[in-house]
Amino acid sequence: MADAPFWHAKALAELSLAEWESLCDGCGKCCLHKLEDEDTGEILYTRVACRLLDIAACRCTAYQDRFRLVPDCMDLRQVPDQFHWLPASCAYRLLSEGRPLPAWHPLVSGAADSVHRAGKSVCRLAVSETVVDCIEDHVIEGLGDAV
């Protein structure tokens, strides 16, 4: 019998850095600005992306320096109790909740672009924060809800 994939065999805290990084599907949703409803605590996604996000590629243009350049960029390895703000489709959130990766995830599909082909990335909807005046005008209902 073949060995189970690492994400089945290990807890998130046990993953190597390479394994951790490979869990990212490249959707770009974590790089979108989010707002929190003060009354309900609901996380509202916007289509406004961090200035470092290459929207077409859904990749950070300064990944190694992102925490220095964007002080509120979160190191997910350091805040596992904060996964609730990640989209429901995020591998880190799914695995922390004991749920499987979706069929379109690159580790499951074997294709790096499967997240884009499945329409799960922000490459066709995001706009850079550098061209937006009012983030509140760009809230997108339900963006973080669907797997």
Curated annotation (Swiss-Prot):
Enumerate the InterPro entries for this protein. Answer: Puta_zinc/iron-chelating_dom (IPR005358), UCP006173 (IPR008228)
Top-level taxon in the UniProt lineage: Bacteria
Disulfide bonds, which pairs? none
Pfam families in UniProt: CxxCxxCC
Family, according to the entry, reads as follows: Belongs to the UPF0260 family.
Report what the protein is called.
Answer: UPF0260 protein MCA0521
